[in-house]
Amino acid sequence: MTIAPTPDWNPRSDAVQQDQIAAYDHLRDQYGAAYSEMLHWSVLGHADVLRILQDHERFSNVVSRHVAVPNGMDPPEHTAYRALIEPYFTQERVEAFRPVCERITAELLQALQGRREVDWVAAFALPFAVRIQCAFMGWPMDLEAELTEWSARSHAATLAQDRPALDALAAQFEGIVARMLDERRASGADPQQDVTASLMHATVLGQPLGADAIASILRNWTVGEIGTISAAVGILAQWLAEHADLQATLRAEPARQPEAIDEILRLHGPLVTNRRVATCPVEVAGRQIPAGGRITLHWTSANRDPRVFEAPGEFRWGRNPQDNLLYGAGIHVCPGAALSRMELGVALRALLAAVASLAPTAQASEPAHYPAIGFARLPLQLRWA
């Protein structure tokens, strides 16, 4: 019988949840790999995270009893499903979706016109993320409230480690997917024009996708993207509100916006962690992890490692983009990176064009709690152009 190590930290503590970035920086510098009852072995250094990402034989992605396509798979199964998914995120498809993203962005900003103070998360970041994902998958916009509530309840249940609630939420999402599939069967939706209908006709290794696989893919494309895109849009707005000089630079030189987005999101990542499991006894950052040991990779910490990024807490132009783990690395690198970059670029460019200045207000922001990051509430002052 394996005896669990004495915990090094508590991910649910108030101190961690009030400032996740500072907490993970401290853990990385003190431990490299730190144990907790909730997250088990948290790996925090850039080199260690990269090593694990590139070694699926010793660090498996098969971490859940639920189907997770393709992020919960290892080769060769992962390879087959990845080949199915990647065509949905080609540059051609991304550019075809750009006008839809621009329309949604314009509608949200138009609704805010004239308001001098807003909670940016509630007024823009969250509805933007939900609406663009619904549009991408061909889902109706009247799902916005249900998906927003579902996402919030899922985050709360994850932090509380409430297994019955998580199971109920999984069943609820499967119900949403079932409704979407039934609607397409009834209407004869064109798989060439509708992403969800296309998945219903897809095959892997000569076999049609099962209902569990379709639900898993759609869950990744909704839950994952809603959380990370809304967090990213909030983080970008907060950083620019605090740095008027960078605002001015990006208005004057819009071609620099893509690099700025990636650097801001290196400083304050929109995704906190991913999971792995050790398939054999391994040593990571001087800690002994047994076979079957649960591992949590901390993107936010790895991307602020001073051994890779000089002055890691500073915004700097010209950093090596290959070092930035914003979209992961290795065989599980985010297949939707081009889509996410387009969406964030559209949102930022439109915001900077619509407002002459973006600034903090006297009200304090509220941090989002794990597994989310960024802001639960972000009061901003807008001066319209």
Positions of the model-derived regions?
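Cytochrome P450
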Residues: 1-385
